[in-house]
């Protein structure tokens, strides 16, 4: 039996494989690029070795670097995870030559299914129905155009070696065919090094279903039922579930039979998935799409409904162990739904989001599994896939699983980057989610693209950001909100005006404006400019953790650092800059100033010095201006005194904590 496995992957799948290995008593080896040196998967492994610079071709796709790490660590086997090298024959051959166990199917199965053209030929021979189209050897433009006219429009151009939507184009007319073929070929060549194309009739209302297979090296093969993967964006899955709803028993059995027939045809001996498209306009007629000869991202929904650990079975099968069940022994219980949590902005065409995380708190919800590759120390870089992790909910019914999942979405607190969590929650809330699904779901639900829900728009959170900044100044760590003491209602704190004008700006959207706060009490403010303004109440938290606020019946968490305010509510994160009026007696800078110095409480550019050595200043008097986050930040004297020394010059970029102005106490004249 293997006792040390190297996982040739990163992120959430590496962490997920480690979890099973720990349970089995197997030591783990992580590999990492320079960009991933502090990544979560590196810290969770027993051993971690560097394999090269950030670009994948120089690290995670470098077979020699992977083999060198396996040799140096003493690993006996390599698990490829998914993506990267998981279906590359080069890695399998290298493992064989090095005497290492490759945890996956045999080489011939991967080779057969690695080409969409070859896989369709094998599928047809096995009696598996395929989408009408063309997958011939003649790849000339003339022949492909001729076949396109025969198939009819609309149709799909697909890369033979493709996946994840790369090298795929929908063509609606003959006039567009040549241009789209050129684009698809170029993309396929760049992504896969293979420009061969196939053509398929476009199914207008397709469902995307798949069947999980599990085999061993003794000729045994079983299915673990189906998964629904129809909710997609840009041909990439977003939400998956098991079982599939609105599916007849007859179609379900046809899927199982077809998947097993294909698996037997290639002697499949590990975990793999056979994917189908169902034509809703033809009674859910199933057609073979492709076979993935590896673990799938969405494998947890099968694990939760069957109780079978697919990673464990991959390892056991690779070690020559027979499957412990027959087909009739395998049952499933309840319903499971998974969402993929990505670092992206759905409101901006799913634009990727990068940067260091400022906070990361995973949800703890009964019946919900978190497969994550991030924590509070992580940084999202542009070098790798946008997926941060997955939330998978299990329940006795689909409704129970969905509600648990929505609760988990609302409680996964991620700061520092934009995620698709708000969109995922809205999708789960739609009545259409209870109807038969199709791959057009997101296009039909959001015809103009997904937009931030009204309750989370900047104008609704600007006042909360301003209030959070104010509360952070008036409630130092260790203080207790007055809202927790019933009956106490005071006027504005000493040193503060009855109303306060603050300039606010949303870091992502650029939305900016001025909020005028009416300071009703130390723990209660309202937007003076708004009609029928509802108060923002501080309801807890200023003891070192996040502030907790309530506004219009909605709860928020806020963290404040200088003039940067991070807000979190209902699974949605925003970061605001807040600039107070010049001359306030209390500011963020004052809170961080010592009795003898005015210091920069955040990194920034020193744009103005308002004092010089020898000048007498009073408490709260502006002494300098910093520019940070495209806002100007006024630094004020913490007490009266005489300027003794200037610690930085205009034009300097100063780090947080830099003394800008040093003060001496005023000399009292003796009489």
What role is predicted for each listed range?
Residues 168-170, 201, 247, 387-396, ...:
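Short, well-ordered beta-strand elements within core beta-sheets of diverse protein domains
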Residues 1-274, 278-299:
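N-terminal beta-alpha lobe that positions the nucleotide/phosphoryl donor
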Residues 203, 292-295, 345, 542, ...:
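A generic structural motif
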Residues 173, 215-220, 278-283, 364, ...:
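Short acidic-glycine loop/turn motifs at beta-strand connectors
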Residues 587-671:
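Structured functional modules or segments
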Residues 555, 561-601:
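Catalytic P-loop NTP-binding/switch module of NTPases
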Residues 300-542, 622, 655-671:
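Catalytic cores of soluble metabolic enzymes centered on carboxylation/carboxyl-transfer
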Residues 3, 166-167, 243, 385-391, ...:
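Short amphipathic alpha-helical segments
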């Amino acid at each position: 039996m293997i006792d040390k496995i190297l996982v040739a992957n990163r992120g959430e799948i590496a962490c997920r494989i480690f979890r099973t290995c720990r349970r089995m008593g197997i030591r783990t080896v992580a590999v990492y690029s320079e960009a991933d040196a502090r990544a979560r998967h590196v810290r969770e492994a027993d051993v971690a070795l560097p394999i090269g610079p950030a670009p994948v071709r120089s690290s995670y796709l470098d077979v020699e670097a992977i083999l060198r790490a396996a040799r140096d660590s003493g690993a006996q086997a390599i698990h490829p995870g998914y993506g990267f090298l998981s279906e590359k024959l080069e890695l399998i051959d290298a493992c064989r030559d090095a005497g290492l166990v490759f945890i996956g199917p045999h080489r011939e199965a991967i080779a057969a299914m690695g080409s969409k053209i070859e896989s369709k030929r094998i599928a047809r021979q096995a009696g598996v129905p395929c989408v009408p189209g063309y997958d011939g050897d003649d790849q000339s433009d003339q022949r492909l155009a001729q076949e396109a006219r025969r198939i009819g429009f609309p149709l799909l151009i697909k890369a033979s070696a493709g996946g994840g939507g790369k090298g795929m184009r929908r063509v609606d007319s003959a006039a567009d065919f040549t241009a789209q073929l050129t684009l698809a070929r170029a993309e396929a060549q760049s992504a896969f090094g293979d420009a061969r194309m196939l053509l398929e009739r476009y199914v207008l209302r397709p469902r995307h279903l798949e069947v999980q297979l599990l085999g061993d090296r003794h000729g045994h093969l079983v299915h673990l039922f189906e998964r629904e993967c129809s909710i997609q964006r840009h041909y990439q899955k977003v939400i998956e579930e098991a079982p599939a709803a609105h599916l007849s028993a007859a179609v379900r059995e046809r899927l199982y039979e077809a998947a097993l027939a294909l698996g037997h045809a290639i002697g499949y001996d590990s975990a793999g998935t056979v994917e189908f498209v169902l034509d809703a306009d033809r009674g859910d007629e199933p057609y073979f799409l492709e076979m993935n000869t590896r673990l799938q991202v969405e494998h947890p929904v099968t694990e939760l409904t069957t109780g079978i650990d697919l990673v464990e079975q991959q390892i056991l099968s690779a070690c020559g162990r027979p499957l412990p069940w027959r087909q009739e022994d395998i049952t499933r219980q309840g319903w499971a739904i998974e969402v993929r949590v990505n670092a992206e902005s759905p409101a901006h065409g799913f634009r990727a989001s990068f940067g260091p995380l400022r906070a990361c708190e995973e949800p703890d919800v009964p019946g919900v599994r978190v497969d994550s590759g991030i924590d509070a120390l992580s940084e999202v870089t542009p070098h790798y896939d946008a997926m941060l992790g997955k939330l998978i909910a299990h329940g006795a019914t689909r409704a129970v699983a969905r509600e648990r999942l929505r609760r988990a979405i609302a409680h996964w607190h991620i700061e520092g980057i934009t995620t698709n969590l708000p969109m995922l929650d809205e999708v789960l809330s739609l009545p259409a989610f209870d109807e038969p699904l199709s791959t057009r779901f997101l296009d039909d639900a959001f015809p103009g693209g997904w937009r931030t829900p009204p309750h989370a728009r900047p104008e609704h959170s600007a006042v909360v950001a301003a209030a959070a900044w104010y509360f952070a100044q008036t409630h130092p760590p260790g203080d207790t909100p007055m809202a927790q003491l019933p009956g106490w209602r005071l006027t504005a704190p000493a040193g503060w005006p009855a109303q306060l004008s603050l300039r606010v700006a949303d870091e992502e959207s650029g939305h900016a404006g001025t909020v005028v706060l009416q300071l009703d009490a130390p723990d209660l403010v309202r937007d003076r400019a708004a009609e029928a303004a509802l108060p923002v109440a501080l309801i807890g938290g200023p003891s070192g953790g996040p502030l907790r606020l309530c506004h219009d019946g909605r709860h928020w968490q806020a963290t404040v650092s200088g003039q940067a305010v991070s807000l979190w509510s209902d699974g949605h994160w925003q970061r605001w800059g807040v600039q107070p009026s010049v001359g306030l007696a209390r500011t963020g800078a004052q809170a961080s100033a010592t009795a003898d110095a005015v210091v920069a409480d955040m990194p920034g550019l020193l744009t103005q010095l308002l004092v010089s050595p020898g000048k007498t200043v009073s408490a709260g008097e502006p002494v300098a201006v910093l520019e940070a986050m495209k806002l100007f930040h006024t630094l004020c004297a913490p007490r009266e005194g005489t300027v003794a020394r200037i610690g930085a010059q205009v034009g300097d970029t100063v780090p947080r904590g830099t003394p800008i102005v040093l003060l001496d106490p005023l000399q009292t004249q003796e009489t």
